[in-house]
Design a protein with these regions (language model features):
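A composition/biophysics-driven feature that prefers long, compositionally simple stretches
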Residues: 1-155
């Protein structure tokens, strides 16, 4: 069955020239972190784990100022404000440019395929060192769909 397609001319969008970007100040970034920490206290979260990839990075970026490009990443935020970034090879350099102070853990499995995997450890081992044993409530922000074959990789 053939369908007739009608094209319509519409007005070009308005172009705003000489508009300068708004840069987020350190004060703004710290205020964001404080808002999250206050909400954690209100909701009684001891820790939050933020998942990010190129398509799902806004929550992570809200605090760190960047989205892990090409890869995945995690941000673990403790109720005392301490933060840890878990990043693959391509993003290791971004920790020093993050807008919040954070420790860095290299997790090669978050790297692109065929990258060096030296020092690889299980994510569950990383969490054993990071997650507070006395924590009563740990939240997860973001998501990743795992297939049944990949479920065996997760021991959280």
């Amino acid at each position: 069955m053939k369908r007739k397609i009608n094209y319509t001319h519409i007005a070009e969008p308005t172009v705003f020239e000489n508009v300068f970007p708004t840069y987020l100040t350190n004060e703004t970034m710290m205020a964001r972190k404080q808002k999250v920490l206050q909400r954690m206290e209100t909701e009684k979260f001891d820790q939050l784990v933020f998942y990010a990839d190129k398509e799902h990075g806004s929550n992570f970026e809200y605090l760190t100022g960047f989205i892990p490009r090409f890869e995945e990443g995690l941000l673990v935020l403790n109720k005392d404000g301490a933060a840890t970034l878990i990043l693959g090879n391509e993003n290791l350099k971004l920790c020093q440019h993050a807008r919040i102070s954070a420790d860095l853990i290299h997790y090669p499995a978050f790297s692109l395929p065929n990258q060096p995997m030296a020092g690889e450890q299980k994510l569950s081992q990383i969490f054993e060192t990071l997650l507070d044993e006395t924590a009563q409530k740990i939240g997860i922000v973001g998501w990743k769909m795992f297939t049944t074959q990949q479920l065996s990789l997760i021991h959280i």
